[in-house]
A protein has these predicted regions:
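Short, amphipathic alpha-helical interaction segments positioned at domain boundaries
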Residues: 487, 493-518
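A short, conserved structural fragment
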Residues: 472-485
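Short acidic, hydrophobic short linear motifs in intrinsically disordered regions
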Residues: 436-459
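Long, contiguous, compositionally biased segments that the model treats as domain-scale units
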Residues: 1-254
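Short, hydrophobic-biased segments on the C-terminal half of alpha helices
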Residues: 464-472
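Short alpha-helical segments that sit at the start of domains
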Residues: 399-439
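DNA-binding alpha-helical recognition surfaces that contact promoter or target DNA
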Residues: 447, 469, 497
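Extended, non-transmembrane interaction/recognition domains
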Residues: 141-400
């Protein structure tokens, strides 16, 4: 069962666990015309000269705006121009829906000028010829907000300038509410969170169905709403939208019987996370140039909110966080913005008959099921880590075995020295919160265990060999395990308990110890 260790620890206070998409942002691109060569081909097929591009493109824009807004005029819904692109559009749309009593259908169309990628024609000073260029410009964007019969409250936007790029925002919990209403499953809801569900198992089955819908069909319906003239504009050219996932949030909600049940353990969990996951008040870890492929930063922090405290760990563009919602719900949520650090078992892109191998996860919706698997595994590992909070096993008994030599592949491996500085630094490194998302590699540990970059290749090899020996020692003591088909490692449940206990012991003062034994 997912989150089994957490359930074993706190199951008597929990009414159910629900996992699935929260925020899901998809983008549609007309791949045939998002490049200069693609646009040149379209102009050639449309018999449009480069000198006439501006006038022709403006006509296309006016046609799109007129057609996109026609439904609002027909239904007497407002079309509102926003002077600032920074205006909270969701808040503005919800205010309109509340004032007008809208419970289904179109709420409003909000328009504003925003930066967008589009085309323009310029004269090349070297060749003295007109050439199309694809660059960042500012153009009118149309945001449609509506209450969908399938997805519930949602929005989608389309830029009015070529190549008419689209972004669709859906919330999995909002979608689930519609599904439960249709299937007569009772629930109590606060915002995008369910405080209780009459039949959690059935709700989870419904949420799992979200992964199996025909996304091209569902999204084509949205395209027709945003641009009813798409078929007419590109008739006979075979130009259609390619859909990718810009961002997804996979959330696991643990529903407690009472708010007081969660309140009794949540502060200790946050404290546990801040201390043993190396997180604190605006505590940051800069991971610049950890290895040749790493260009981002690694950070962990926590934030006080009016409703409670949120702890968050980031690794490059991806993150995992934990926070309390609606009083009685603990949510752990993995956010994926960059899928390239994750793997999926698939053939080579564009060659379905090639050998199936573990390859980088793609942005396309074809890999949406794997995104769910990665998010669930990440959340489960994080909840496993939280389950180690305040263990009742005596520390001496817990660490006794790791303080003895072990055997690994018929070779003797030394004992850990958990309170010696070198091994303590190693335990802190493998317990960093961001490694709950996708594990860690030899090179990740090198960046944490050495103060500066290696001076030469020989030093690089020596460091790699040293860390390999440390990894072998951790595996011999069953603290970590290898992720299949990768060079990554994750803490085992046993390792979580050991490492959390050792690191937590570093925070205990003599005064606190005296109170415990008094």
């Amino acid at each position: 069962m997912p989150t089994s260790r957490f359930i074993q620890r706190f199951g008597d206070r929990i009414t159910g666990v629900l996992s699935g998409f929260d925020r899901l942002v998809l983008r549609g691109s007309l791949l045939a015309i998002v490049s200069v060569q693609g646009m040149k081909r379209l102009l050639w097929l449309k018999h449009v000269w480069l000198k006439d591009f501006g006038r022709w493109a403006q006509q296309m824009t006016e046609q799109l705006k007129e057609a996109s807004c026609q439904a609002a005029r027909d239904q007497n819904r407002p079309i509102v121009y926003l002077r600032s692109a920074n205006t909270d559009k969701d808040e503005a749309a919800r205010k309109i829906a509340a004032e007008d009593g809208i419970t289904t259908g179109l709420v409003a169309i909000l328009t504003c000028v925003e930066p967008c990628m589009s085309f323009e024609i310029y004269r090349n000073p070297q060749t003295h010829k007109l050439e199309p260029v694809y660059r960042l410009r500012k153009g009118l964007v149309l945001y449609h907000y509506w209450i969908d019969s399938q997805f519930g409250w949602m929005n989608a936007r389309i830029q009015s300038w070529l190549p008419f790029s689209i972004q669709v925002c859906i919330n999995g919990r909002e979608w689930l509410a519609r599904m439960m209403d249709h299937n007569h499953v009772g629930y109590r809801r606060h915002d995008n969170c369910f405080m209780s569900i009459d039949d959690v198992a059935k709700a989870q089955r419904l949420m799992n169905r979200q992964l199996r819908i025909s996304w091209p069909k569902a999204l084509q319906r949205i395209v027709r709403q945003l641009n009813p003239l798409h078929g007419q504009m590109f008739r006979g050219l075979g130009i259609s939208y390619y859909w990718s996932i810009y961002q997804n949030e996979w959330a696991t909600d643990v529903m407690f019987q009472k708010a007081s049940d969660l309140a009794a353990i949540y502060p200790a969990m946050i404290l546990h996370g801040m201390r043993t996951f190396s997180s604190g008040d605006v505590l940051r870890f800069l991971g610049r140039k950890v290895h040749g492929n790493f260009q981002g930063e690694i950070t962990s922090d926590f934030k006080d909110r009016p409703e409670g405290v949120r702890i968050k760990h980031r690794v490059k563009e991806n993150s995992i966080k934990a926070y309390d919602k609606a009083g009685n719900v603990l949510r752990v949520e993995t956010t994926m913005n960059d899928p390239r650090d994750f793997k999926v078992l698939r053939p080579k892109h564009g060659d379905p008959h090639s050998k199936t191998q573990w390859r980088p996860l793609r942005r396309g919706i074809a890999d949406i099921y794997r995104r769910a698997q990665v998010g669930q595994a990440s959340n489960d590992r994080y909840l496993d880590a939280l389950a180690a909070t305040d263990t009742s096993t005596p520390l001496g008994e817990l660490i006794r075995d790791i303080c003895k030599p072990a055997t690994y592949h018929h070779k003797r491996v030394r004992a850990l020295r958990p309170w010696a500085d070198p091994d303590l630094a190693l335990l802190r490194a493998i317990n960093r919160g961001e490694f709950s998302v996708n594990g860690f590699r030899n090179r990740d540990l090198q960046s944490l265990l050495f103060d500066h970059a290696a001076d030469n290749d020989d030093e690089n090899r020596r460091r790699s060999a040293r860390v390999s020996r440390l990894l072998r020692m951790l595996r011999a003591h069953h603290l970590i395990q290898k992720v299949p088909h990768t060079h990554r490692y994750v803490l085992t449940p046993y390792g979580r308990d050991i490492v959390s206990a050792v690191l937590a012991s570093q925070q205990i003062t003599l005064q606190q110890l005296n109170k415990l034994v008094a």
